[in-house]
Regions:
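Glycine-rich, basic loop-to-helix element that forms the pyrophosphate-binding segment
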Residues: 62-79
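A conserved acidic beta->alpha catalytic loop
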Residues: 39-48, 88
Length: 184
């Protein structure tokens, strides 16, 4: 099956990190992709930068949601890909093969949800300060507080639309999202 991957990014005052985020998306060697950016009014030239973006990048203005989970849901609903992932404005892909590997994994495993590793780096992005290494999923680990980071998760669109982020939980909306997603 031909995959298309939609990536959702929410940003407010995201410069200069947003440039690295977008550049890492654009450098992906997987061609059937789109980046959906939802932005809030910023005071750091974010809006001016976004106006210059073209191609597979779609930009929407935030409509005053209570927290970051509302704009994420908005972006997910705008996604046209059959796979959806999240890339925060201050995050970036470590190499050009990430989306290709995601698509291959969906094709070979026939899974609905996929998650992977995350590297945390210093502000200057030159030094890795922490690694979150994925492991085989065990449902019981969720009850113990373990969860894969939501930015490492890719979900089939038909599944994520049924399991959007709850805006009732401004701090733990991502945890609730993961619990709902993995408890189906």
């Amino acid at each position: 099956m031909k995959q298309k991957i939609s990536i959702v990014t929410v940003v407010k005052n995201g410069m200069p990190f947003l440039k690295d985020c977008v550049k890492s998306f654009q450098s992906q060697n997987f061609s059937s992709k789109e980046l959906i950016i939802i932005y809030s009014k910023s005071e750091d030239n974010t809006e001016q930068y976004l106006k210059k973006l073209k191609g597979s990048i779609r930009v929407f203005k935030d409509v005053k949601y209570k927290n970051k989970f509302g704009p994420l849901n908005f972006g997910i609903k705008k996604a046209t890909g059959n796979i959806v992932g999240i890339l925060h404005a201050d995050d970036f892909y470590p190499n050009a093969n990430v989306l290709t590997n995601v698509a291959k994994s969906f094709n070979t495993t026939k899974c609905d949800v996929l998650y992977g590793n995350i590297l945390f780096c210093s502000k200057n992005r030159k030094k890795i300060v922490r690694k979150w290494i994925s492991r085989t999923f065990r449902k019981r680990d969720l009850a113990l507080g373990w969860m894969p980071p939501h930015t490492s998760i890719y979900v089939k669109r038909v599944e994520i639309i049924k399991n959007l982020y709850s805006i009732k939980y401004p701090i733990s909306g991502d945890y609730k999202f993961i619990l709902d997603l993995f408890h189906k």
